[in-house]
Curated annotation (Swiss-Prot):
InterPro entries: SAM-dependent_MTases_sf (IPR029063), tRNA_(Gua-N-7)_MeTrfase_Trmb (IPR003358), tRNA_methyltr_TrmB_bact (IPR055361). This is tRNA (guanine-N(7)-)-methyltransferase. It comes from the Bacteria. Gene3D superfamilies: Vaccinia Virus protein VP39.
Length: 240
């Protein structure tokens, strides 16, 4: 995380004059043929522009259906699998890494999916500018950068202010689902979300939930399991 930008998180729809620290680093990456195909052929069909006002996603998808938004889908394997397994639902992915966007869109083209759209820009801007309040059934944040060093903790995306932004965008009863493979970050997210108003932890013990069946296991996660590494899932429901 070496960059900042002019548009901070807002919970009242108003821009703030200070500059916001980004929670991600823009990485250069070489495109494969398939990824480039995804961008060239799928981009015009499935990449949504950053809007100035809330988007009517019923119009975008041509129907009203349960709607999930994932922040930072990486190479898109899990999101693609989830969208293919639930054609009755609509999915929106947000990712700034162009090879990842291309990989996901290549999969969308290959599988002929109609229930997935993509933003290739900052997720905070997408939430603030494009997503209406009380409109999402679920928001997913899987394996975000934990920013291990203490001096970098301010760069973590999960903060009280972010939790409030997510809460506003979720419908009543909507779910904020997080997952991480680094236990200190899991503990940190649990602490933040437990302090965030307007949420209920869905874990029976008030901590973590078992891996939900709807979250696919990635190759990285399987390798970690073989090495004895854990993964922690957190699910918080919007209440009130």
């Amino acid at each position: 995380m070496t960059e900042s930008q002019d548009t901070p998180i807002t919970t009242d729809g108003e821009a703030r004059p200070h500059r916001r620290i980004k929670s991600f680093v823009m990485r250069a990456g070489r495109m494969t043929e398939g990824q480039q195909r995804g961008l060239d052929q799928g981009g015009p069909l499935y990449i949504l522009p950053l809007a100035e006002s809330p988007v009517d996603y019923d119009q975008v998808f041509g129907r009203s259906a349960p709607r999930t938004l994932e922040i930072g889908f990486g190479m898109g394997h899990s999101l693609l699998e989830m969208a293919a397994a639930a054609p009755e639902q609509d999915f929106i992915g947000v990712e700034v890494h162009r090879p990842g966007v291309g990989a996901l869109l290549n999969g969308v083209l290959t599988e002929g999916l109609k229930n997935l759209r993509v933003y290739d820009c900052d997720a905070i801007e997408v939430l603030n500018r494009c997503v209406a309040d009380n409109s999402l059934d679920r928001l997913m944040l899987f394996f975000p950068d934990p920013w291990h060093k203490a001096r970098h903790h301010k760069r973590r995306i999960v903060q009280l202010e972010f939790a409030e932004l997510v809460r506003r965008k979720l419908k009543p009863g909507g779910i904020f689902h997080m997952a991480t493979d680094w236990e200190p970050y899991a503990e940190y997210m649990l602490e933040v979300m437990s302090a965030a108003p307007g949420y209920r932890n869905l874990a029976a013990d008030g901590a973590y939930v078992p891996r939900p069946e709807e979250r696919p296991i990635t190759k990285f996660e399987r390798r970690g399991e073989r090495l004895g590494h854990g993964v922690w899932d957190l699910k918080f429901e919007k209440v009130g």
